[in-house]
Amino acid sequence: MIDKRDFKAFKLVSKYDPSGDQPQAIEALVDNIEGGEKAQILLGATGTGKTYTMSQVISKVNKPTLVIAHNKTLAGQLYGEFKEFFPENAVEYFVSYYDYYQPEAYVPSSDTYIEKDSSVNDEIDKLRHSATSSLLERNDVIVVASVSCIYGLGSPKEYADSAVSLRPGQEISRDQLLNALVDIQFERNDIDFQRGRFRVRGDVVEVFPASRDEHAFRIEFFGDEIDRIREIESLTGKVLGDADHLVLFPATHFVTNDEHMEQSISKIQAELADQLKLFEAEGKLLEAQRLRQRTEYDIEMLREMGYTNGVENYSRHMDGRSAGEPPYTLLDFFPEDFLIMIDESHMTMGQIKGMYNGDKARKQMLVDYGFRLPSALDNRPLRREEFESHVHQIVYVSATPGDYEMEQTDTIVEQIIRPTGLLDPEVEVRPSMGQMDDLLGEINLRIERGERTFITTLTKKMAEDLTDYLKEMGVKVKYMHSDIKTLERTEIIRDLRLGVFDVLIGINLLREGIDVPEVSLVAILDADKEGFLRNERGLIQTIGRAARNADGHVIMYADRMTDSMQRAIDETARRRAIQMAYNEEHGIIPQTIKKDIRDLISISRAVEAKATEAETNYESMTRSERQEAIKQLQKNMQEAAELLDFELAAQLRDLILELKAMD
């Protein structure tokens, strides 16, 4: 059994004190949590410092906290911010570890079976293991996750019970330790020392935990007793210090012991027999043969190796769950009284609701045609009501809370006033007739003042046509479409801020991360066309893009006033009035946010350049030169991973593997 460390409080490190609306919001949220309120909403306007408020709340209530974001990009940003706020506590990152994922599927109309194909990102896998091990070892944990946290993960009890606990002076033979490591899916490799592997040199065993990336452990034996445990650099073997206790968690989240494995296999065989009878009774002989062949192969692999590709499809039997019972997820690794914070809840809660149905439709086809046993349906994401059953206390965070959140609670804490004194922008409506000439005039005014412009359209064609028109008029403009990758997107935003171009056009510019203080004008074309991007929430989010500049202004081009437009304008005016009154009372003059232009791109490019240089010359290198190149590339890979640029980290990893294969 694992002993958690002594209770450790969260320690928030920041050069700022709460200001504006933050003190009252923090106090209200904390009082509600300590008073036992199950659900509440933090309605925070854009730029009011919601993440800082969330951090203050976490530090005051001292509960393990799960922060859920609706995509990897936003989760990465939040992870970076929380790491800065809590350098002495465990801040973890838990998102899907696939760089590429093609799920297993079957298309009956063309009799096409698509085998599961995926590429696992080693860095993210390491971070996932770090998250689960931290949750089992300590209490001061913040996990920033995407909706991947509601997918099946394996039993936390089996994961914890399988952990190998080691101390100096403990009586255990070297061979007993080796057997224990193999049982928890560690792989012996005396040459290529990586995460989830161990190597043996006489009476010394070196183990590389699945949750680490640079540090491993050296266990030295004296007879059948552990003499010493040392922490070492995995690459150089340099000793970093002695350890008085080491807990090695399994190298995979799906793990079970021998006794449970035999019980699981018996259940799989019983289910297989039942399903074969059903297929044969229906005359589905091809499906029966297919299912028998695939399942018996998997059973043999489970018996011999304790693991098989697609083991998650048998997780119901491995975990000892009943049919239809929800799978274990990351949420089960938390203690009962943990806190959940849902960032951009109007988006995230919709994702949580939609995950289950899409997954079931695909898997049902595999079951019907004999590719999987019916129990595979229980390897799934949680339904929304199952997610709700895990909730002890929850805070929904959004500038525009959705209907679902509003139905869950009447407790709404507003955070309207910005620490900078910035006001919500003025909004005006202009007719669409002659909008191009009118817009061009407004853009030129901003260019003269050294400011930037966002334009949001409804269709790709209109965005492309408008881009061409503005280019012909001599405007430096770019169009950001959905095919652009994360790194390119970051580069475009950076170039806009630096003034490489002055106008950015897009269909959905209300997405997270598009916060550019230099933008003083947001133009919304076809504002009267009701729909997802032109409903009240969409309009408020888009209006918020101009709230980082003291001269922020929004123009809606429309031929009529829709209910959504009116509500968005009224809400913006309400917030603006509150902000103006606060500024007047406290003598605050709004100042445009001074935000550093983070040079993520140049750092990534420097790493990329080193990788390219090594790739160009490695064939002519000597063996020792290649070893040096590998060391440098591994450092570059870590650098890219710390910047959360996992695509680049994966490319560097592949190059390292190529170099190693040459020796």
From Swiss-Prot:
Single GO MF annotation: ATP hydrolysis activity
Keyword Iron: no
UniProt name for this protein: UvrABC system protein B
Subcellular location: Cytoplasm
UniProt keyword Nucleotide-binding, yes or no: yes
InterPro entries, sorted: Helicase/UvrB_N, Helicase_ATP-bd, Helicase_C-like, P-loop_NTPase, UVR_dom, UVR_dom_sf, UvrB, UvrB_inter
Motif interval(s): Beta-hairpin: 97-120
One BP term from GO: nucleotide-excision repair
Family to which the UniProt record says this protein belongs: Belongs to the UvrB family.
Domain Helicase ATP-binding: 31-271
CDD domains associated with the record: DEXHc_UvrB, SF2_C_UvrB
Main subcellular location: cytoplasm
Function: The UvrABC repair system catalyzes the recognition and processing of DNA lesions. A damage recognition complex composed of 2 UvrA and 2 UvrB subunits scans DNA for abnormalities. Upon binding of the UvrA(2)B(2) complex to a putative damaged site, the DNA wraps around one UvrB monomer. DNA wrap is dependent on ATP binding by UvrB and probably causes local melting of the DNA helix, facilitating insertion of UvrB beta-hairpin between the DNA strands. Then UvrB probes one DNA strand for the presence of a lesion.
Domain notes: The beta-hairpin motif is involved in DNA binding.
SMART domains found in the cross-reference section: DEXDc (SM00487), HELICc (SM00490)
Binding positions for ATP per the UniProt entry: 44-51
Keyword annotations: ATP-binding, Cytoplasm, DNA damage, DNA excision, DNA repair, Excision nuclease, Helicase, Hydrolase, Nucleotide-binding, SOS response
